[in-house]
């Protein structure tokens, strides 16, 4: 990967910063659409501020059905829905954007298809330079992780808490932390500079999804009492 110059970083820092913060719910992989919608409703009712529809096992028809149902639900809550990987599906169902990984389409291609109003998030794993380059290429947020052992994904790369602190110094777009996050370890990431925490198993595997979502949301309210740790004033 090429090195990004300081002049490029300075130009990128002038770009508008989207408000992406709080609990970022990543849906579980299930073929039961009604159950998926019901679980996501509970997460939204508990305070989730962003939803990502992620499915790796379903056929195209069911994938489309679920994405459309979640788009309708998220509009009711006025919460953005992002589609994992699939740009065309995001356009088809009227989702608010996409989340892309290392093997997915480049940001430029996604932006060309989606336009400037849609959200594009990028997985940067444990690579700060990838995040800097993603910002310069027009990403709306970057995701670092895994910070802890993940049940949802077993092929993750470890990321350190210091990466969040360094990210605060180098980039201005929101930073999402991901990987093995639960309500017991999330505050450490938020305090280190994560604008949002992306959670799947600890949220949707909870006995009471709504209460668990509220617990995560409460961590951000708790952090708001420490303005010196906030990135919004940068």
Curated annotation (Swiss-Prot):
- Species, as recorded: Nitrosospira multiformis (strain ATCC 25196 / NCIMB 11849 / C 71)
Q: Which family does it belong to?
A: Belongs to the thiamine-phosphate synthase family.
Q: Which HAMAP family match?
A: TMP_synthase
- Pathway(s) this gene product operates in, as recorded in its UniProt entry: Cofactor biosynthesis; thiamine diphosphate biosynthesis; thiamine phosphate from 4-amino-2-methyl-5-diphosphomethylpyrimidine and 4-methyl-5-(2-phosphoethyl)-thiazole: step 1/1
**So where does Mg(2+) get bound?**
85, 104
Binding positions (4-amino-2-methyl-5-(diphosphooxymethyl)pyrimidine)? 52-56, 84, 123, 153
Please give the SUPFAM superfamilies that the UniProt record associates with this protein. Answer: Thiamin phosphate synthase
Q: How is the cofactor bound?
A: Binds 1 Mg(2+) ion per subunit.
One Pfam family linked to the record: TMP-TENI
Q: Which UniProt keywords apply?
A: Magnesium, Metal-binding, Thiamine biosynthesis, Transferase
- List the protein's name: Thiamine-phosphate synthase
Q: Which Enzyme Commission numbers does its entry carry? A: 2.5.1.3
Instruction: State the Gene Ontology terms under molecular function.
Output: magnesium ion binding; thiamine-phosphate diphosphorylase activity
* Leading EC class: transferase
Name the encoding gene, please: thiE
Share an example GO biological-process annotation for this protein. Answer: thiamine biosynthetic process
Catalytic reactions of this protein: 2-[(2R,5Z)-2-carboxy-4-methylthiazol-5(2H)-ylidene]ethyl phosphate + 4-amino-2-methyl-5-(diphosphooxymethyl)pyrimidine + 2 H(+) = thiamine phosphate + CO2 + diphosphate; 2-(2-carboxy-4-methylthiazol-5-yl)ethyl phosphate + 4-amino-2-methyl-5-(diphosphooxymethyl)pyrimidine + 2 H(+) = thiamine phosphate + CO2 + diphosphate; 4-methyl-5-(2-phosphooxyethyl)-thiazole + 4-amino-2-methyl-5-(diphosphooxymethyl)pyrimidine + H(+) = thiamine phosphate + diphosphate
Q: What does this protein do?
A: Condenses 4-methyl-5-(beta-hydroxyethyl)thiazole monophosphate (THZ-P) and 2-methyl-4-amino-5-hydroxymethyl pyrimidine pyrophosphate (HMP-PP) to form thiamine monophosphate (TMP).
| Highest taxon, organism lineage | Bacteria
Alphabetized NCBIfam families for the sequence: thiE (TIGR00693)
As cofactor, the record names:
Mg(2+)
Any idea which positions bind 2-[(2R,5Z)-2-carboxy-4-methylthiazol-5(2H)-ylidene]ethyl phosphate?
Answer: 150-152, 180
One Gene Ontology cellular component = cytoplasm
């Amino acid at each position: 990967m090429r090195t990004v110059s300081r002049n490029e970083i300075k130009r990128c820092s002038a770009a508008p910063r989207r408000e992406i913060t709080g609990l970022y719910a990543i849906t579980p992989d299930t073929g039961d659409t009604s159950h998926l919608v019901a679980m996501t409703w509970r997460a939204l009712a508990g305070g989730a501020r962003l939803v990502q529809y992620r499915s790796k096992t379903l056929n195209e028809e069911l994938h489309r059905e679920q994405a459309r149902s979640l788009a309708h639900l998220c509009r009711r809550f006025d919460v953005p829905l992002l589609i994992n990987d699939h740009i065309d599906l995001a356009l088809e169902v009227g989702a608010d954007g996409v989340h892309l990984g290392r093997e997915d389409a480049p940001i430029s291609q996604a932006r060309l298809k989606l336009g400037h109003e849609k959200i594009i998030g990028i997985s940067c794993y444990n690579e700060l330079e990838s995040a800097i380059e993603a910002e310069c290429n027009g990403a709306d947020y970057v995701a670092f992780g895994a910070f802890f052992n993940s049940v949802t994904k077993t092929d993750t790369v470890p990321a350190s808490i210091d990466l969040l602190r360094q990210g605060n110094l180098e980039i201005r777009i929101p930073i999402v932390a991901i990987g093995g996050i639960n309500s017991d370890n999330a505050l450490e990431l938020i305090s280190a500079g994560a604008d949002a925490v992306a959670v799947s198993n600890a949220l949707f595997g909870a006995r009471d999804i709504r209460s668990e979502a509220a617990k995560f949301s409460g961590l951000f309210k708790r952090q708001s009492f420490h303005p010196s740790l906030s990135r919004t004033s940068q």
